[in-house]
């Protein structure tokens, strides 16, 4: 009976984790379609319904026409063009609401029925808190783009993505806790191996941060060659901003260079990890995920950011991180 209850909780956590990955994809599509600023208000309840008639559409369009983005980039756009942008952002927000409901309602049920332990309730409550923070961050990010300069800060974009990653990590690791069983094995797992995987996971998080910087700064639109950057291993314009440290965060060439370098470093470290733990199947999933993610990144760069591949690259970063969490959970179970 207890195993069946754990299975139902695990299925729920898996569904929530998948929905977060899908949300990341929808968010990426919204950004690349330049639709994120088309809805100028945040109404958590009434906003769940789209404009239902022509009068409502005219009202929404008139609100958008007061924004700097409309005046600067979309002046004179047709109603059909506006509807397309609006519906993309609407689906983004609707899916966020749906994800929240699919998490909250079963969470209340499982808690009241004592299907989950107090420790798990605390962990999932933390995830819920981050979900609320994520909603406010998303709106603040949109609001920041409705001012004189119609551009969303790449720092806000990164924070928005990182909060999604934190929620994904909390839910998926708890899912792995339910699914990964302790096995009788002759494999000796040392504490150093666990720490080594932890370092790789930290590097993946840093890599996701710089991936968000690349996206927010449009750094993928320069140096569309691989492995060289403008014919050089190290491009010449890495440190032209002053003070020098600012290049790490705001120089497009530097941000892309760091993103490339981290990808290769993670590949090398994961390859070493695989060689040292060759008898563990889950480590091969992690290595394969790294290879697929690098291929997606290189293709995205070479083809000048095609939307489908770029979104796949963004979504797969979470799957890569999840594969690392799964292997970490396995190691801790064996310990």
From Swiss-Prot:
Q: Where in the cell is it found?
A: Cell membrane
| Record EC number | 1.17.99.9
| Keyword Cell wall biogenesis/degradation included in the entry's annotation | no
Q: What membrane topology does the UniProt entry give?
A: Multi-pass membrane protein
Which InterPro entries does the entry mention?
Answer: COX15/CtaA_fam, HemeA_Synthase_type2
Asked if the record carries the keyword Secreted, the reply is no
Q: Which reaction does it catalyse?
A: Fe(II)-heme o + 2 A + H2O = Fe(II)-heme a + 2 AH2
Q: Which domain of life is it from?
A: Bacteria
Q: Which residues bind heme?
A: 259, 313
Function according to Swiss-Prot or TrEMBL = Catalyzes the conversion of heme O to heme A by two successive hydroxylations of the methyl group at C8. The first hydroxylation forms heme I, the second hydroxylation results in an unstable dihydroxymethyl group, which spontaneously dehydrates, resulting in the formyl group of heme A.
Fill in the subunit field for this protein: Interacts with CtaB.
- This one is known as Heme A synthase
* Organism expressing this protein natively: Wolbachia sp. subsp. Brugia malayi (strain TRS)
């Amino acid at each position: 009976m207890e195993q069946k209850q754990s299975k139902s909780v695990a299925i729920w956590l898996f569904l929530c984790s998948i929905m977060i990955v899908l949300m990341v994809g929808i968010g990426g599509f919204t950004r690349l379609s330049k639709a994120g600023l088309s809805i100028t208000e945040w109404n958590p309840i009434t906003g769940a319904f789209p404009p239902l008639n022509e009068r409502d559409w005219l009202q929404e369009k008139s609100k958008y026409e007061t924004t700097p983005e409309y005046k600067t980039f979309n002046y004179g756009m047709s109603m059909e063009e506006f509807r397309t942008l609006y519906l993309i952002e609407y689906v983004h927000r609707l899916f966020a609401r749906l994800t929240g409901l699919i998490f909250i309602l079963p969470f209340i049920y499982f808690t009241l029925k004592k299907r989950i332990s107090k420790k798990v309730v605390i962990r999932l409550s933390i995830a819920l808190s981050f979900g609320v923070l994520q909603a406010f961050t998303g709106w603040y990010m949109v609001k920041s783009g409705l001012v004189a300069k119609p551009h969303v800060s790449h720092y806000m974009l990164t924070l928005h993505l990182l909060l999604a990653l934190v929620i994904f990590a909390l839910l998926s690791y708890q899912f792995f806790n339910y699914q990964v069983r302790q096995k009788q094995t002759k494999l000796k797992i040392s504490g150093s191996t666990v720490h080594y995987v932890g370092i790789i996971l930290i590097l993946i998080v840093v890599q996701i941060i710089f991936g968000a910087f690349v996206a927010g700064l449009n750094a993928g639109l320069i140096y569309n060659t691989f492995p060289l950057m403008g014919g050089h291993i190290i491009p010449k314009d890495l440190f032209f901003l002053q003070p020098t440290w600012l290049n790490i965060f705001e120089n497009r060439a530097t941000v892309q260079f760091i993103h490339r370098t981290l990808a290769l470093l993670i590949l090398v470290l994961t390859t070493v990890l695989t060689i040292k733990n060759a008898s563990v199947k889950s480590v091969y999933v992690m290595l394969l995920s790294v290879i697929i993610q690098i291929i997606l990144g290189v293709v995205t760069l070479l083809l000048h950011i095609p939307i489908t591949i770029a979104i796949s690259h963004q979504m797969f970063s979470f799957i890569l991180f999840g594969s690392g969490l799964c292997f970490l959970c396995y190691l801790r179970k064996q310990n």
